[in-house]
Amino acid sequence: TAVFSQWPDHNLWNETDRKPLSTYGTMAWQEVEFFYYVQFILDRQMRAAHEYAVARGVVLKGDIPIGVNRNGCDVWHEPHYFDLNSQAGAPPDGFSVNGQNWGFPTYNWQRMIEDGCLWWKRRFQNMSQYFDAYRIDHVLGFFRIWSIPVDCVHALTGQFAPSLGMTRDEIESYGLHFQEDLFTRPFISRWIVNRVFGKHADHVIDKFLIHSHDDIYELKTEYDTERKIEAAFAGKTSDDDIWVRDGLYSLCSNVLFVRDNNDSNKFHPRITAQLNLMYEALYDSDKAKFNALYNDYYYRRNNNFWYSEAMKKLPTLVQATRMLVCAEDLGM
């Protein structure tokens, strides 16, 4: 398996293992040397292509995606630079109502900044051997990244990281009485079950839910995250199964606020909460208060903070090489 966390003897990188694994005659030597050779040949080919282009007045532009594979060598070798309890993605937009979950880990920017972002500098400097310009794919990731809990399939209960979460007092300053359990736990009433599942409502109540009080239900422990639901429906492809699975996903994200990843006493309005059934259940006056809070949070509150965060990283990285920097981004 390529999932290094499952390797019995080498799930954590140990530099002292390098020499024995690369020593002639050892069990792993032949395979290790093969990949050394592949990288050596690729380096020669890339350098030759670059020199050929430059000699003819052609500039080569490379691409640097914001993330790396969760099971890649970067994470294995230097896990302290990454937050393995989250996954990066993008908020919902007109093309993806559930947002995007890219799956790769977010960065531990505080740790990176402590050593002057050496990991990123090495990445850029290595790339400068083959390219004259580069495109940062998702440059907004240097300002803030959409951080999704690892137990999620969709991106709806993510939050921007870093960002300024709201205290209870700040939320209530908009006139909205903050009911923590009601607003942060999936709101599942009988009318919502009927609306979401239709003819499957009774089956869903019997198999996936437990009664809480009045006409309110909760997800059973074995189905209380999107990843658990995904596993339960693995291999099931009928229309009815997909209907129920996607409905259960929607229950998981039927909240008004998500708790801050770093401070349990702070909260973020759930992205596009106005489209969920928890919002529909509010009084019109509370909807107006939530909308005011939501718009301030997503379009004003964090702007200066995000700018200052980017300025801790981007200037030093841009100056790390002579390559021309191009930035790209789409969406929110």
Language model region names:
Residues 1-332:
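Catalytic cores of glycan-processing enzymes that make or break glycosidic bonds
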